[in-house]
Amino acid sequence: MGLSMSTYYADPKISRAEKEEQDADLRGKIEQIRVEFPRTGYRMLLHHLKRQGIKIGETRLRRIIEKFNLQFKPTKRFVKTTDSNHEFEIYPNLIEELMIDDINQVWTADLTYIRIENGFIYLAVIIDLFSRKIIGWQISKRIDRFLALDALKMAIERRNPPRGTIHHSDRGSQYLCDDYTELLTENGFHTSCSAKGNPYDNAWTESLMKTLKYDEIYMYEYKTYLNVVEKLPKFIEEVYNKKRLHSSLNYLPPEEFENKFANKNESEYQTNVSRPSFRL
């Protein structure tokens, strides 16, 4: 037809047959996006398509999703793995109402379980709160301090954070034990903890865990420890960090956001995460 991709999808003068062909083409593109991000909703789909050069209105996108029954189905919540019944020191919450506006300003940490055929294995992650990038992770058959320590060591080795970086976690014993807090102190971190029993206090890492589980682990039915150690690292490094769009990052993936932030004036990349607020 001699039209650009964006014009092609927006042209009101095309025939009925051409429109059907367009719908089928869009269906294919939506399904390709959903392969990597099964829970992607209407708004995020619009931004994924836009990055491919396709301009389409939300009304038409909704029509196509309904026409081809492409809606994603809500999934159940998963259980947290926090062990807060311990005698280690509890630290104050340092990020409540904090203006978060830089890389390596706040790191958050969390643990979760992964159900496989013969039991459970466990994942620990460290996230840069400003960019949402997973900067450290570890997988283990045991949920202990070594799992959390290895994820932290990876993050420190990769980022070489400045002294004064805040490390925020829930009140789990893995993050407040002597080995862990000593490593934080040695590297100049300020330690911060969530308020007791507050489900919103560490919502960013919980949201990430949900993404990992429902966009990858549950979707592809990991059955063995080998499945997890072979596939999950690739999803973290190649899909989540490099491809998953975040509305709070101006609809950019974490790694791309960090690269642009490093090369541009930071005022161009202020995000909604700047002022977290909590109901305590």
Where are these regions (language model features)?
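Acidic/histidine-rich, metal-coordinating catalytic segments
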Residues: P162-C177, A195, L252-P253
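Conserved, non-catalytic sequence blocks in retroelement Pol enzymes and Pol-derived host proteins
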Residues: F37-R39, M99-D101, I116-E117, R171, ...
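C-terminal domain-tail junction helix/linker
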Residues: R16, D178, T185-F189, T211-L280
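An active-site-proximal beta-strand-loop segment
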Residues: I100-I135, K141-R142
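RNase H-like polynucleotidyl transferase catalytic core
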Residues: P74-K80, H167-R171, T185-W204, M219-T224
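Basic, flexible linker segments flanking DNA-binding modules
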Residues: S6-I103, N198, P253-N263
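Mobile genetic element proteins and their domesticated derivatives, centered on retroelements
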Residues: M1, Y8, I30, L45, ...
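Active-site beta-loop-alpha junctions of metal-dependent nucleic acid enzymes
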Residues: G119, Q138-N160, L176
